[in-house]
Amino acid sequence: MRLQFLAPLALVFLSVRAAEPAADLEHGRVLFLQSCALCHAAGPGTTAGQGPTLIGVVGRTAATSPNFSYTKALQDSRLVWDAATLDRYIANPTIAVPGTTMVIAVPVEKDRQDIIAYLSTMKSQPGGDPAPAPTISPEAANDPRDWRHASPGTMHRVVVDQLPAPFATVSTRNNSAVVPRPADARLAVPAGFSVQLFAEGLTGPRLLRIAPNGDLFIAETRSNRIRVLRPAVDGASASANELFADGLDRPFGITFYPAGNNPQWVYVANNNSIVRFPYQAGDLKARAAAEVVVPKLSETTNGHSTRDIAFSLDGRRMFIAVGSGSNFAEGLPKKSADEVARWDAEHGLGAAWDFEFHRANILTTDPEGRQPLKVFATGIRNPVGLAVNPITGDLWTSTNERDGLGDDLVPDYVTRVKERAFYGWPWYYMGKFEEPRHAGFRPDLAGKATVPDVPLQAHSAALGIVFYPASSGAGVFPAEFHGDLFVALHGSWNRASRTGYKVVRARLKNGIPTGEYQDFVTGFVVDARNVWGRPVGVAVARDGSLLVSEDGNGTIWRVTPAAKR
């Protein structure tokens, strides 16, 4: 599913340098599988991901591979991927081409040399890239999960026992093209609600968090910074817009500590570390440099790069979500039964190893980071968003599941996360179903994977989540919404019929999920090929209104009961 952004595409346009005598092709192939194959095809054993193919990239003009929506920055760069240019790009993409959505770098020169040498052996075949999925088809028109059928109030339930077999449909690369928001674009919300533009002109706003005083903290991940907006008195717009901190490393998760009206710290989850800034209520700019709390989360930083953080209700534990480096741990070396048993005993049931060590799981430590990182739960491919239920104390996550098995596999999900539970990845999915690409690899895990609470339509790309509290205020929702969970769906790329691109409401009853979810905000899709918005963050403002960020055109939207604008 969605790679770390991916949105930010992991190694989207790998540079290529002429192979040198010292280059190690096999090492380059392994590095490619570990770092790039999640998004890019480049030869045998790799399939098309959400990024452009890298077959034939050597000598290619930037932003010319068909069937992919490139950033304007890369289109305007007019670069040709010769050895020197491409090596410079992969070393630091955002410096080489400011505005590119590729943020993952390969800092080690020898690694770049080996990857480039491997890529230089990959030549385009007659026929070029595969054609994109058809823009209109009878199948799409009749598919109840297609974007055309999204409508506020529509209920959904994914029944695990009715899932199709793997490869029942062909795995399709069907990227959306992000276009400027049309003048007549209108978001749709349920009857009795209203939605208005809250802020615009932001740079790829991702996760949202509300400070106790009501300020809105925004992760502008691609720009490596945190921004703060202060809502106006009526809550309908921002009266202040300030840069809180920059110079970060792909910041995503934000939270405040300790709980209450006067937190002392703002915690930020970087790609591979946790830092915090001293904070007093009302600060619009960081009052001091960041303090490192956890210096390293994992040994690898490729693949999914979003990291979220949350604290337990008692404030004693800090939870950290770390996504996988790959789609399904392709290329993972095998271990003997004894080696597997020892590994599981030390790192948790079903935990992957090698380049996936400390990946695809939720880690925990104390708020000061003094205790060694421990695995809280395993087998969660890309746990993007975290939230603690303010009533029950349960930890929840949103998860992007694996790609390549067909239009309706594997369901994404939101779920309560149980300590020491195993959620399947990479060996199984949705409890009992074995991953066919690892058939026979871990028979000992049969029947041991936990089934998630709320499966979502496959390839929806669930990102930010927030519980709706029983609050008061000018924008407060009706009581029936209190305790439910809102989920931002960034939208599909690996499905013939487009799905996601909306905000949904997961229903809970007395803190227990019903398994159903409901369309709540729709209207981000223009047509079968184009979208203007991709929802990422959701947050409940101090006045009770719901705020939604989208990183396609850099806007934030505000949902209120219709009579409470």
Model-identified regions with their sequence ranges:
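Sequence/structural segment immediately N-terminal to covalent heme-attachment motifs in c-type
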Residues: 22-44, 54-55, 199
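Detector for the c-type heme attachment site
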Residues: 39-46, 59-60, 91, 120
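C-terminal capping alpha-helices of c-type cytochrome domains
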Residues: 80-129, 546, 551-552, 561
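Beta-propeller domain segments
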Residues: 136-190, 263, 306, 324-374, ...
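Surface loop/turn motifs at the tips and blade-to-blade linkers of beta-strand repeat domains
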Residues: 197-202, 243-249, 293-301, 375-379, ...
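Asp-box/WD-like beta-propeller blade repeats and closely related beta-sheet repeat scaffolds
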Residues: 239-241, 245-257, 264, 270-314, ...
